[in-house]
């Protein structure tokens, strides 16, 4: 493919990425965090791409956050060496962690139980290596972690230090923020996140245990935090791309969404009000993250080739390789005439879930011309 080729020439379905929107989204959050005096440790789990990583990291070596050891291995090969593996560690993963640290990667891990801590201590003793650990704190009862006032936080910290691991600090993630909407609710979630992490850090220090890192973050809370006192870093990832869920929460506008799926119209069922496209769940994913929001976007919002949304036109059903596009229930909008062979773009509900269906980004400039292809990787 030649540079500056029209997206009309692409084989569909294809994953499109507006590099100008990516730059704008990164600059927005970086400016906000600079104003709060806290650095960003970007999450690369959505990107899974070295070119995107280089755009969002402050240095070529990091820092960054990942969600799989495959990401650690791929980014380390590209020169990224300051990485937080932000999924609770399983004992079976520790040999790979040790191998990566032996190769020079400053890889830290997270845990929230004595069993995990014992496995880490055993690995440290057997390998004569200190593995850096952050204790995961639960800020909102939505996922993993210990409550900040749980005495296990201190017990785990002591076990790690006495057993030869490195207690690097605490971390938390406000999973509940994805169920909030509006500035006030998201600010409240951000403050709960900060308070939980800082309280746990204070408890560790009061027990004469080290806690240099206090790590918080999600894309919604990162944008609406007003005070990050006591926090040493913020983690966020989908802000680079944004999606319909983030738009529904009020974190971004639809015009900020940098990722879309290009699809071809392959049929009509006019009596049913259906347009058929060649992007099914293997391209869009089956994420229904907007289902409980004020506006349900189905499986994604349909746009014309320029990226302008069709009024109330959404993906309403998915099969493996077919998508059905129709007007949302109750709409009074006029059903558009989109002939077979036409190209449309779908804005995804969940950028992370959609991106993982593809092995490359078709990178667009400000004129929506394809100027590059950036490879993605997958796996665990």
Predicted regions and their residues:
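Generic N-terminal amphipathic, Lys/Arg-enriched alpha-helix
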Residues: 1-17
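Conserved, mostly hydrophobic/aromatic
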Residues: 22, 45, 75, 135, ...
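Active-site-proximal beta-alpha core segment in soluble small-molecule metabolic enzymes
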Residues: 43-179
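Active-site loop ensemble at the mouth of alpha/beta enzyme cores that anchors a bound cofactor
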Residues: 221-303
């Amino acid at each position: 493919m030649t540079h500056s080729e029209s997206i009309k020439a692409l084989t569909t379905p294809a994953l499109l990425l507006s590099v100008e929107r990516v730059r704008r989204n990164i600059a927005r959050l970086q400016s906000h965090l600079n104003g709060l005096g806290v650095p960003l440790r970007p999450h690369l789990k959505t990107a899974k791409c070295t070119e995107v990583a280089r755009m969002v990291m402050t240095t070529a070596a990091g820092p960054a956050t990942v969600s799989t050891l495959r990401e650690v291995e791929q980014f380390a090969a590209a020169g990224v060496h300051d990485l937080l593996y932000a999924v609770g560690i399983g004992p079976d993963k520790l040999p790979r962690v040790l191998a990566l640290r032996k190769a020079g990667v400053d890889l830290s891990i997270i845990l929230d139980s004595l069993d995990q801590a014992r496995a880490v201590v055993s690995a440290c003793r057997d390998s004569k290596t200190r593995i850096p650990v952050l204790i995961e704190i639960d800020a909102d009862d939505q996922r993993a972690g210990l409550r900040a006032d749980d005495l296990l936080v201190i017990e785990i910290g002591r076990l790690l230090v006495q057993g030869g691991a490195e207690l690097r600090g605490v971390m938390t993630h406000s999973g509940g923020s994805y169920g909030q909407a509006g500035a006030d609710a998201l600010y409240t979630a951000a403050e709960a996140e900060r308070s939980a992490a800082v309280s746990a850090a204070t408890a560790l220090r009061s027990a004469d245990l080290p806690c240099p890192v206090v790590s918080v973050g999600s894309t919604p809370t990162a944008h609406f935090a007003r005070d990050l006192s006591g926090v040493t870093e913020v983690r966020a990832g989908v802000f680079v791309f944004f999606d319909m869920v983030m738009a529904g929460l009020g974190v971004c506008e639809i015009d900020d969404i940098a990722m879309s799926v290009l699809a071809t119209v392959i049929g009509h069922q006019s009596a049913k009000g259906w347009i058929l496209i060649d992007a099914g769940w293997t391209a869009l994913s089956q994420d229904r993250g907007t289902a409980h929001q004020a506006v349900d976007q189905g499986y994604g919002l349909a746009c014309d080739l320029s990226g302008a949304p069709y009024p109330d036109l959404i993906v309403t059903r998915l099969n493996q390789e077919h998508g059905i596009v129709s007007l949302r229930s109750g709409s009074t909008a006029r059903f558009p005439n989109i002939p077979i062979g036409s190209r449309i773009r779908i804005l995804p509900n969940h950028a992370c879930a959609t991106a993982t269906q593809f092995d490359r980004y078709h990178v667009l400039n400000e004129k929506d011309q394809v100027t590059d292809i950036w490879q993605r990787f997958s796996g665990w």
